[in-house]
Amino acid sequence: MRRKDRENNSPEFFELVFDKAEIINIAFRDEPFPYCLPFNFGKIENKIYIHCAKEGRKLDLIRAHPEVAFNLAIDIRIDREKYTTYFKSVCGTGQASLVEDPAEKAAALDAIGEKYAALCPRPSPMSLLNRVSVIKIAILSLSGKNCEPRED
């Protein structure tokens, strides 16, 4: 990171951003350009979970190239007088895979529902498990950046 004064790689910072972020943007490897999409997500330990339809482009891309990149940002505020934006962000890389184990799939969907306080039954019913795909991203690297107003 070029701006070492803004770097924040503490586990507490990572947890803060993951807890408060409402959306995660995930870039999948495609040709000639990456394919980047926003998702609701859940996190269990060092794994990110998203859900999607049972077929589609992202699943095809994961099967061909499971390496992904992602980013999350919170506390975004534009200061027009100072021509800057304040934020806390985390960028990372990971290895994506399709979750096949019903227990892990249910836990992932429960984590997503819990994060968004969804009014859905928990534990997730088997009928839901059969209707959706769940993707697991095993986190390989994280990098945090914190741009806050300075006390002058």
Cite the ranges covered by each PLM segment.
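Active-site-adjacent structural patch at catalytic or cofactor/ligand-binding sites
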Residues: 53-54, 64-77, 86-96
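Anion-coordinating catalytic cores for phosphoryl-, nucleotidyl-, and glycosidic chemistry
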Residues: 5-6, 15, 57-60, 70
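Solvent-exposed residues in well-ordered beta-strands and their adjoining turns
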Residues: 44, 53, 73, 97-99, ...
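Short, intrinsically disordered, mixed-charge
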Residues: 19, 64-68, 110, 114-118
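Short glycine/proline-enriched turns and hinge-like loops at secondary-structure junctions
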Residues: 34-36, 62-63, 83-84
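Charged, gly/pro-rich active-site loop segments
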Residues: 1-5, 80-152
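Extreme N-terminal tail/first-helix region
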Residues: 1-20
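Short beta-strand segments
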Residues: 21-54, 70
